[in-house]
Each structure stands twice: as C-alpha cells, then as structure tokens.
Swiss-Prot record:
It catalyses: 6-carboxyhexanoyl-[ACP] methyl ester + H2O = 6-carboxyhexanoyl-[ACP] + methanol + H(+). SUPFAM superfamilies: alpha/beta-Hydrolases. Keywords: Biotin biosynthesis, Cytoplasm, Hydrolase, Serine esterase. One of its GO terms (cellular component) is cytoplasm. Belongs to the AB hydrolase superfamily. Carboxylesterase BioH family. Substrate binds at W22, S82, L83, F143, L144, G145, L146, Q147, H235. It is found in: Cytoplasm. Pathway: Cofactor biosynthesis; biotin biosynthesis. The lineage of its organism: Bacteria, Pseudomonadati, Pseudomonadota, Gammaproteobacteria, Enterobacterales. This is Pimeloyl-[acyl-carrier protein] methyl ester esterase. Residues 16-242 form the AB hydrolase-1 domain. GO terms for biological process: biotin biosynthetic process. It comes from Sodalis glossinidius (strain morsitans).
Amino acid sequence: MVSLFWQTTGTGDRDLVLLHGWGLNAEVWSYIVPRLATHFRLHLVDLPGYGRSRGYGALTLEEMAEEVASRAPHGALWLGWSLGGLVATTVARRCPHAVAGLVTVASSPRFCADGDWPGIRPEVLEGFARELRQDFTRTVSRFLGLQTLGTASARQDTRWLKSVVLAHPAPAIEVLTGGLALLRTSDVRKALDQLDVPLLRLYGYLDGLVPRKVVPLVDELSTASHSIVFAGAAHAPFISHPVPFCQALCDFSQLES
C-alpha cells in the first residue's frame, strides 16, 4: 500500500507546496520553515518513494506530478528544488488553473548536458547510478558534497544535508536510480514557453549541477519569468543564503497575490 507523506504547518494565509530534490526528503526545508511559517501555510511533501512516502516504485515525471497534485490545495504556490523543480513544473503544465505561481530552485528544464545546452555530463549521472548499487551511503554523500561545493559554509551544509538523508529510512535503490534516470532524460524546455502561471527561478552562482550558463538560455525560453542568481550560493541556496532566499519568496508571493 502506498502512503504519501504530507505535513502542513504555518500561520500564513497563502499555501506553499515545497518539493525536495533527489535522494532527500521534506526535512530539508526545516532550515527555512521558521522564517516562512508566519507568511505561508507550508505543505511539506516527501516525494513518492522518498523519506516517509513508502510503497512506491520508480515513477515517471507525470506519475509523480499526478500523485502530489492530487493532495495539494487549489491555488497554491509551488516550489520545487532540483528534481522537485521538474515535478513542480509538470504540475503547473498539467494543472495551471490550480497553481497560483511556480518557483524553481537550482533546477533546469534539462539537467543533462546536450550539445550547446550546459548541464551535468550524462556519464556522471550514469556513474552515480552504478555506484548506488555498490555503496549507497558513499554515493549519496558524494552527491550531497557536490551540492554545496564552493560555498563558504560547504562543510557545515553538507553535514546538515547528510543528517536529513539519514533521519529516515533510505529510499529503495529502484527509486533512486529512477530519479537519476529522470534527471538524465527529462526535457521540459518546450513546456516552459507554454506555462500559463507566474514563474520565479532561483539559482546559485557556484552551482556545479545547474551551471549559471543555463540562466540566460532559460530566460529566452520563458520570457515572462524572472530569475535571481544568489552570489556565493551553490545548489542549495535556501541553506547557504536563507535570508535573501526567503525574502525572494515573500516578494514573489506579494506580487502574485
């Protein structure tokens, strides 16, 4: 039997659904929940197969989007980090009438490098998938290290991310390799131009997984969207730069209210 973990907290009058990235769970948002809880009703979700959402196998992007959208309040803002950004974008494309606004964080419509499109080399993601079967802890630790690489608080932030992963049972290898496959193969670039919801895109200047070179390319794909690049941040700007990150969210919410 499948069970989707969904926790609601906060005293604000605006619903905000938060979707985490690959290998993690909703505990990753605990770093900024206290800052956001007075502004929003926060909906903290473990993506299917991750954290406390048990009983799922590897899902497609469409299946994952359908699963989380079925539980969400109508008219919410949606925020997706990394892989969660692909899921949130798919929700906004499928159900624009139910989404008041979309925020993607350190996310790309295509994560994998492709010709002139900057991104993660395919062989890197394929290597992670192979290594997962041999040593889960080491592979996830290496991936988390890449997310904070270059920031002033890299060591501290990586330790904190590892504690989030270890706080709950590890996802099944099938789910993790399926998630890596989504990062390797998903391409929602065409969908961006067709989105009928306000879009804010947040990036880290030092991000090694979603390089800043992608920002002007997505600007061209989604001319109505707005992008912010946090100097000194990498793949997890909400951890390394929580104050300006939360301010950007609150400003976006007020503009779209």
